[in-house]
C-alpha cells in the first residue's frame, strides 16, 4: 500500500531517496529520479506480461551494470507481435496497469518505423496532475536474436521498503546486444552515407568486454545475422575485418565524451587507451577467428 498521502509527498520522498543514493553512487540526483520513473514503467510492462517482452538498449545495460551509461530511452522487443500495431496495443495495456504507486504513464503520439520495424512513441510520466518526465520508447518487432534471453530481478535504483512489487525483467540476449552495437557502429547513413557517430556503442561494448563472458561462435553468428537484417532493410553496412573507428576525425573527441559517461568503464577514457581492448575483443569477431569464450579477466578469446 502506498504510504504517501499525496503526490507531493511521494515526489519529496523520491527526491530524498535520490539525494541519499547520489552520495553513495556519485550519480546526479535528477538521473536517479528519472531512473526510478523508468523502472516503475518497466514494472508495469513485466507485471502485465512477464514473458511477452525483452528489454534492450541502454536500460538493459543498466539492469546488468548499475553504473553503466545513463539512458533516456526504453527499447523493447515484442517477439510475438505480427505487426507494430500489435506491439503498440500490448504496450498501451501494460502502461495503463495501476500498481498503486501514484504514477500514471500517458502515451502521446506514435510513429511507425519504416518496413515494419516497430514504433516510436513518447510517454509522459504523471505524478498526480504534474508531468515529471517524458520517456522516449522504441518498440521493435522484426528482430531475430540467436542467443537466449535472460530473466533477472529488477533491482530498484532507489532502495526502500516501498514499492516492493519489483518483477523480474527479460533481457535481450547479450550476444545479440553485442551484435547490434557492432553493426550500429559501422552502418553508414544517407545523405552522403555519413559515417556512424555511435560513440556510445564502443563505450558500451568495452564495458561488456570488461564484465562478461561470451561464446565466440554464437556471437559471430549473431553479428552476421544482424548485418544481414540491416542490409535487407536497405542499410549500408560493410563490416571491417579488424577494429577501426568509422571516422578518425570525429571519433577521438566523440568517444572520449561517451566514455566519460560510463562510470563503470575502467581504463578506456580515450581511443588510445581503449584500442588494445577493442582490438582484442572485436577483431576476432569481425574476422571470424574468435574461438571458445571471451575471458574478461584475461581480455582474450580462448
Locate predicted features.
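Structured mid-to-C-terminal alpha-helical surface segments
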Residues: 1-53, 62-74, 78-302
Amino acid at each position: 500500500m502506498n504510504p504517501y498521502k499525496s503526490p507531493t509527498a511521494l515526489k519529496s520522498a523520491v527526491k530524498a531517496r535520490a539525494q541519499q543514493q547520489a552520495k553513495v553512487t556519485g550519480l546526479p540526483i535528477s538521473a536517479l529520479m528519472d531512473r526510478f520513473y523508468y523502472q516503475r514503467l518497466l514494472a508495469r510492462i513485466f507485471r502485465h506480461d512477464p514473458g511477452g517482452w525483452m528489454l534492450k538498449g541502454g536500460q538493459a545495460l543498466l539492469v546488468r551494470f548499475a553504473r553503466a551509461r545513463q539512458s533516456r530511452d526504453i527499447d523493447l522487443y515484442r517477439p510475438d507481435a505480427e505487426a507494430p500495431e500489435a506491439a503498440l496495443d500490448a504496450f498501451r495495456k501494460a502502461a495503463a496497469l495501476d500498481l498503486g504507486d501514484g504514477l500514471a504513464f500517458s502515451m502521446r503520439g506514435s510513429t511507425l518505423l519504416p518496413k515494419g520495424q516497430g514504433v516510436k512513441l513518447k510517454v509522459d510520466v504523471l505524478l498526480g496532475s504534474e508531468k515529471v518526465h517524458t520517456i522516449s520508447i522504441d518498440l521493435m518487432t522484426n528482430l531475430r536474436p540467436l542467443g537466449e534471453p535472460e530473466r533477472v530481478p529488477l533491482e530498484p535504483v532507489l532502495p526502500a521498503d516501498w514499492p516492493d512489487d519489483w518483477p523480474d525483467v527479460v533481457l535481450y540476449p547479450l550476444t545479440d546486444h553485442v551484435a547490434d552495437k557492432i553493426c550500429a557502429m559501422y552502418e553508414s547513413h544517407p545523405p552522403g552515407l555519413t559515417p556512424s557517430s555511435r560513440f556510445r556503442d564502443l563505450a558500451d561494448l568495452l564495458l561488456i568486454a570488461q564484465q562478461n563472458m561470451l561464446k565466440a561462435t554464437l556471437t559471430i553468428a549473431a553479428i552476421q545475422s544482424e548485418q544481414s537484417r540491416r542490409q535487407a532493410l536497405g542499410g549500408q553496412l560493410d563490416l571491417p575485418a579488424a577494429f577501426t573507428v568509422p571516422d578518425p576525425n570525429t571519433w577521438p573527441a566523440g568517444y572520449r565524451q561517451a566514455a566519460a559517461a560510463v562510470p563503470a568503464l575502467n581504463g578506456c577514457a580515450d581511443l588510445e587507451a581503449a584500442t588494445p581492448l577493442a582490438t582484442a575483443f572485436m577483431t576476432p569477431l569481425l574476422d571470424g577467428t574468435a574461438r571458445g569464450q571471451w575471458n574478461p579477466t584475461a581480455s582474450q578469446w580462448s
